[in-house]
Amino acid sequence: MPIRNLGQIVGLAAVLTVLSASAQYDYFDHNRQLIRNGVQAVLSCNGLFTSHRTIDQVFSDELAYLGERVIGTASSGNYTVNRDARWVGVGGGTDGDRVHAVFREGIGCIVVPPDWDMSSTDELPTIDLSYRTDTTRLPWPMGDVVTPTPLDPRISKSALSAAETWAFERSSPEQKTVSLLVLHKGEIVLERYADGFDMTTRTRTWSTAKSIASTLIGMKVDNEELALDAPLAFEWLPVIKDRPAPDPRDAITLRHALHMSSGLYPVDSFGMEYATGSGLAYWAGASSVDGMRNRGLIREPGTFWDYENYDTLLAVFALKQTFANEADYQLFPHKALFDRLGMTNTLASTDRFGDFIFSSQVYTNARDLARFGLLFLQDGQWQGEQLISREWIDFVRTPAPASHVRGNDYGGQWWLVPDERKNEVPSDAYSTAGNRGQYVIVVPSHDLVIVRRGLDYGRQGFNRWDLLREVVKAFPSAASN
């Protein structure tokens, strides 16, 4: 072999080696470590100060989500818990940048960036909920006093008990049910909690929050302060002087955002939410508002379904534009919805700038979510008042056009029974869905609301339609009543 050819081969091999190393290099490694530390800080902070769990419980349950990536143990590790100031810091040194999460009244825990001055925590937002009255002694559903009543004889006790056992006694340890609550005709017919939890325990809703956000937005649409088919009325980023008008993103409507069909560049797909995108707002102290507005349009809006936390936050930011001041915006979820339903154990979290992260960060308990589901079962009526229109409920229950490739399983920030399951479970059911198994399932045909809260982890997720299949065996249809 001529020397020059050998040299070419060696040179080519060197180039391929460099390219291979480049392909294997994780350009987001720093972000991933930062976000992992933030996940542990936020879940620990909320576990301790929002859910009032012990540090042992937090490590065994809340932090099971991190698996082997968790830093330390319940007894020690590279983290700090300040119980007086109510914050948790995680990481530092070889464990990556230290991230803090700080509990704030009326909100829960707010994550701050690594360079945050921890002597400045008083600058972080709070929401004053001291105006609330104690509703716990009121009768259900506005309060927590439940008068025992005989079970409807048409309900199968054995089937209901079997469904309860099915939900709690899972074959995989990765499926941990912490509460199960079933309403029939508005009355609690089943309520059970795992050890260490009770009806007051608040846990994270994850993406079940999206359905709450959609409800608040629907109130504004009903009031004609927002319109489903109007462009999102805010400025896109980056701000460029003399940008040609109109910005192509002005074609995105509220309907597109609620349908997960904005057409914007996806930043949360394929696990990237733990490297970039919304993960930086959830877990690392970035602005949720700036991130969701700083994406380019890559598809025609409404033509492609892609599950993006930032699409929800587009709609939430449109909601914010209807308020004249920050105080009214921050009290709106409580005064418009939570207080009116008796959901007084519910906290909606914000980023450090005061913007609600309604794509994921709400802390509440099973009973409050049951009240939320009951509002929808009652066609938006509550205590004689129409809080949300039937038209809005029809919208959230109608498949997003671009979801047809998925079996028409997604509406307006609510999940629908996919085509492939409609012969197994009531086809009119619709559900919230949050990471780690947070479900509120509304079944009009059977007068049912089913709430399942979980602290699942790993890859063997709990299936809400399987749960519905088991529970509905115990109940007659509304038509038969």
Question: What do the PLM-derived regions correspond to, one by one?
Answer:
Residues 223-264, 294-298, 324-360, 364:
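Active-site helix/loop module of the DD-peptidase/beta-lactamase fold
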Residues 9-18:
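Bacterial N-terminal signal peptides
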Residues 224-228, 320-334, 380-388, 404-405, ...:
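Structural helix-adjacent loops and short alpha-helical linkers that scaffold large soluble proteins
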Residues 186, 204-229, 257, 315-319, ...:
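Active-site SXXK
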Residues 343-350, 393-449:
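Active-site Gly/Thr loop motif
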